[in-house]
Amino acid sequence: MEGKKEMGSYKFCLIFTRKFRMTESGPVEDVRDLFEKYTEGDAHMSPEQLQKLMTEEGGEGETSLEEAERIVDEVLRRKHHIAKFTRRNLTLDDFNYYLFSTDLNPPIADQVHQNMDAPLSHYFIFTGHNSYLTGNQLSSNCSELPIADALRRGVRVVELDLWPRGTDDVCVKHGRTLTKEVKLGKCLESIKANAFAISKYPVIITLEDHLTPKLQFKVAKMITQTFGDMLYYHDSQGCQEFPSPEELKEKILISTKPPKEYLEANDTKEKDNGEKGKDSDEDVWGKEPEDLISTQSDLDKVTSSVNDLNQDDEERGSCESDTSCQLQAPEYKRLIAIHAGKPKGGLRMALKVDPNKIRRLSLSEQLLEKAVASYGADVIRFTQKNFLRIYPKGTRFNSSNYKPQIGWMSGAQMIAFNMQGYGRALWLMEGMFRANGGCGYVKKPDFLMDASPNGQDFYPKDNSSPKKTLKVKVCMGDGWLLDFKKTHFDSYSPPDFFVRVGIAGAPVDEVMEKTKIEYDTWTPIWNKEFTFPLAVPELALLRVEVHEHDVNEKDDFGGQTCLPVSEIRQGIRAVPLFNRKGVKYSSTRLLMRFEFV
């Protein structure tokens, strides 16, 4: 960020060369103004002045002088490549370097800071769906590798579908499809090796059990031998409150669900087919980045083969009616810390709270919508003590996902996502769980724990008054030239970047804005401010996408991030961008300013 300029060239029609001035932008006006304000016009900023700036501008209370000195020393070490300093202060360029450093000046904190001593049901939990699949739901391979990847991305709930492999062995696969199986032992070892690599808070394994009592006994032995003292034993059917994440650190919890967890009747299945693709927000945010798993045409080739199997599965319904599927092996039953079942009597009865029992209920994304519309207060009351898991509808063959907001608004702890289903819905999920240090547990807002009879009164209407207003200024961006080839975006010129900025959350809060296009530059400066009034800031996510404008083709993707609004730090911050798969770019970031009013 030194303000240097040099010429860059692009080949045109093979024989012509177009030259562009490649400008490395200096500090933007907001940075210069902030520097002058706290140095009072001096050319250098002392650690004491930086301490005052961080305390007054950051909105996080008192910053210690030791922390300010650490930052000054680190900036000088990195920028000037020297171990000992003749001076201990920052120039304007040094200060700009600090503000643009994603690790020294991040937009959200990277430490666990929420109260972790409440019962487990008081938290949203990062949850995977069919965690063993490498791709689509119909024909992809099953493997232990996606499980390891999910756990290292912060997922705390892993799902395994257990099926007989012959008469004496057990495998993991997506039943009645063409997916290739993987050995259960490999999956268990993968969980053990990766469970607490990123977060020390508990991992829950949900088992979809299609086994005989003999094989249940074998599974119980495998689980016990693999995890040993890591296993947590608990009878959730005889308690009024579940332990806290803090109490369950580095513990593995086993939960079961019925082999078919659907509560829907045939009319719901018909509705599912008719709603395919309805939940997309492409009309507002533009086309979804290209599918990274399977195209629909690829899936159509295997769908017809699977439909007959799935239809037969639907007609048979839950294995609960089959005595061979009951939890008959006592060694297996003893492992179950969180019990799940399919209560009889319909949706209303399923949501009934038993004061002497804690359980987990699973609903499809469509059935959740029905439950919220008809029994919203009951859903919230149920989730204040019990666990509610939401899973993708059956037609998401390509492992796509749904918008998770309706689940969070209803207090559902486990919004089960296909972690290989890259796209905007998964970006939102990853954004939510960047909160609380990325530990995989996020404390639910107080209004979702309100025990009053009218527990759903909080749900915002179109005319809800904002509780808080977030001002966001997109100052500039940098780093693309280090992370991408010079011709990645345009073959004949530097890129033309613009930024989409918006809110995902309560319906009344959802909005999208965008900057103007900055043409022919690798270091675009937008200096565009947006204002977002928020009725439910506790569940709001700030969505940011960078695109490169193309006149005749689809705009190119240039990075994305989602940030929990409740975690955003005030002031000028360096915001790292991620690729379609949620992997952080090495250098690409935005300089943004945040203010709450």
UniProtKB/Swiss-Prot annotation:
InterPro entries (UniProt xref): C2_dom, C2_domain_sf, EF-hand-dom_pair, PI-PLC_fam, PLC-like_Pdiesterase_TIM-brl, PLC_EF-hand-like, PLipase_C_PInositol-sp_X_dom, PLipase_C_Pinositol-sp_Y
PI-PLC Y-box domain segment(s): 333-449
Domain C2: 449-579
Cofactor(s) essential for the protein: Ca(2+)
Active site location: 129, 174
Broad class of where this protein is predominantly found: cytoplasm
Protein location: Cytoplasm, Cytosol; Cell membrane
Cited Pfam families: C2, EF-hand_like, PI-PLC-X, PI-PLC-Y
SUPFAM superfamilies: C2 domain (Calcium/lipid-binding domain, CaLB), EF-hand, PLC-like phosphodiesterases
PROSITE patterns for the chain: C2, PIPLC_X_DOMAIN, PIPLC_Y_DOMAIN
One Gene Ontology term from the biological process aspect of the record: lipid catabolic process
EC number annotated for this UniProt entry: 3.1.4.11
Location of the PI-PLC X-box domain: 114-257
Catalytic activity: a 1,2-diacyl-sn-glycero-3-phospho-(1D-myo-inositol-4,5-bisphosphate) + H2O = 1D-myo-inositol 1,4,5-trisphosphate + a 1,2-diacyl-sn-glycerol + H(+)
Membrane topology: Peripheral membrane protein
Ranges for region Disordered: 259-324
Key words, A-Z: Cell membrane, Cytoplasm, Hydrolase, Lipid degradation, Lipid metabolism, Membrane, Transducer
Keyword Nuclease tagged: no
Compositional bias annotation for Polar residues: 293-309
MF-aspect GO terms: phosphatidylinositol-4,5-bisphosphate phospholipase C activity
EF-hand domain ranges (all copies): 26-60
GO annotation, cellular component aspect: cytosol; plasma membrane
Free-text function comment from the UniProt entry: The production of the second messenger molecules diacylglycerol (DAG) and inositol 1,4,5-trisphosphate (IP3) is mediated by activated phosphatidylinositol-specific phospholipase C enzymes.
Protein name, entry field: Phosphoinositide phospholipase C 4
Organism of this sequence: Arabidopsis thaliana
Lineage, top ranks: Eukaryota, Viridiplantae, Streptophyta, Embryophyta, Tracheophyta
Gene encoding the protein: PLC4
